[in-house]
A protein has these predicted regions:
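FMN-binding flavodoxin-like domain, especially the glycine-rich phosphate-binding loop
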Residues: 2-7, 17-21, 29-33, 40, ...
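Non-catalytic terminal/interface segments that mediate subunit docking, oligomerization
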Residues: 10-12
Length: 153
């Protein structure tokens, strides 16, 4: 897919705002690669918000016991109810903390499962950022997006 017909939507599920900072870095990396994108915090969004994009990029933290952040619940539940995303590609940047081994990046895994079940195709391995790794999530997010975005140009 060339960037000429690629329109990416970056959708952010966050509790503290860190995932939103990651989304900003991903948006910058895509722009540098020549890919048009729009970034949306998931507050109040439903599955209709996905329609304009053929590439979906989900940036999601995990909180509690592997839960989707509150602002992403409506969109997530809409996807769980079933929507046809065949023909759409997606990439996933998950935030978590390995000190919570049982639920590390569990929300990211849940997004992956629901997008796949709706017929979307993941185009790059899930990037799982570990809050206890000593790296800044937003730096890792930008570098991750820059690595694969070049292959779509």
């Amino acid at each position: 897919m060339s960037s000429g017909n690629l329109r990416a939507g970056i959708f952010v599920a966050t509790m503290t705002g860190l995932a939103e900072m990651c989304g900003e870095e991903i948006e910058d990396a895509l722009g540098a690669a020549g890919i048009e994108s729009d970034r949306h915090v998931m507050d109040g969004l439903d599955t209709n918000s996905l329609g304009d994009y053929n590439m979906l990029i989900i940036v999601s933290s995990t909180y509690g016991h592997g839960e989707i952040p509150d602002n992403g619940i409506t969109l997530f539940e809409g996807l769980e109810a079933g929507v046809d995303l065949s023909g759409k590609s997606y990439a996933l940047f998950a935030l978590g903390d390995r000190t919570y081994a049982d639920t590390f990046c569990a929300a990211g895994d849940r997004w992956d499962a629901v997008l796949s079940a709706c017929g979307a195709t993941r185009v790059v391995d899930i990037e799982r950022h570990d809050a206890s790794s000593g790296t800044l999530a937003e730096d890792v997010a930008g570098e991750w997006a820059a690595r694969w975005a070049a292959s779509f140009v």
